[in-house]
């Protein structure tokens, strides 16, 4: 594999990527890391640059939490168009937007749909509901359905914050609108809902908590490898890792998946990268 590099002003040189990797002290296999869900804009400017400059990472899908977040990610993408892919959405674990804010977000998505790779992070506020049992879910469900519709309008996949009891609600909405591409990030649910999920074409991603969380390990063991992706949800902290060292987190997830499925490490790594690229059409 060859890439072009500018070693002197005005002169283009071809560099062998495998040779470059070896000279930098890591194998080509370790360059096949793709973070399918992170909050890049929430990192410090220094860590953003470190993450985007990490040669072990071939790409990343940065999700947004609101319109301001999406705009910042789009600006970053203009600097790193070959490595950074972005999603636009509204994280559900926060107060709902007012009408004006909501319309502004959807208008922005309509205007920039060709620059984004997904609608996300969107979903339902499971953890907020757990803290406030009186939380009205109806407007959140309505907002999720609208995100589903705009994803369908522009043929974009969904990057979803859907866990536990909310899985059935989401699956019903996705089926209602005949959605084929939905990515359930950091997926976990009960056995009954998991069986429903198995009958769909949807994907799930695994975080570093697979190292110790039996629920995440269960997903890795029982979902086909060709429907799995890896993620960090950075800067969310994971025990034993610094949030900025994303490549180390991703490598640890792949290694654990290979162990749980009793498969060769390189095969798992290649397949998960392929899964992500095909799902997001990169």
Language-model features and meaning:
Residues 6-9:
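Short, low-complexity, intrinsically disordered N-terminal modules
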Residues 13-282:
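Mid-domain alpha/beta scaffold segments of enzyme catalytic cores
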């Amino acid at each position: 594999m060859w890439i072009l590099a500018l070693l002197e002003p005005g002169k283009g040189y071809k560099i062998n990527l495998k040779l470059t990797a070896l000279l930098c002290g890591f194998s080509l296999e370790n360059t096949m890391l793709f973070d399918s869900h992170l909050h890049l804009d929430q990192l410090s400017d220094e860590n953003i640059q470190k993450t985007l400059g990490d040669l072990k990472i071939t790409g990343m899908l940065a999700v947004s939490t609101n319109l301001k977040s999406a705009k910042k990610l789009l600006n970053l993408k203009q600097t790193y168009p070959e490595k950074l892919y972005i999603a636009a959405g509204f994280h559900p674990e926060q107060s709902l937007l007012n009408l004006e804010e909501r319309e502004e977000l959807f208008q922005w998505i309509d205007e920039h749909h060709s620059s984004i790779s997904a609608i996300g992070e969107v979903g339902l506020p499971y953890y907020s509901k757990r803290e406030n049992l009186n939380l009205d879910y109806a407007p959140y469900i309505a907002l999720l359905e609208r995100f589903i519709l705009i994803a369908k309008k522009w043929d974009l996949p969904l990057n979803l914050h859907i866990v536990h009891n909310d899985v059935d609600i989401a699956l019903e909405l996705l089926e209602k609108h005949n959605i084929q591409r939905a990515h359930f990030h950091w997926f976990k649910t009960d056995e009954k809902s998991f069986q429903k999920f198995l009958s769909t074409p949807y994907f799930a991603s695994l975080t570093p908590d697979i190292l110790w969380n039996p629920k995440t390990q269960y997903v890795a063991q029982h979902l086909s490898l060709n429907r799995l992706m890896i993620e960090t949800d950075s800067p969310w902290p994971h025990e034993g890792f610094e949030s900025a060292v994303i490549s180390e987190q991703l490598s640890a997830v792949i290694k654990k998946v290979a162990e749980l499925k009793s498969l060769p490490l390189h095969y798992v790594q290649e397949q998960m990268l392929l899964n992500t690229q095909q799902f997001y059409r990169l």
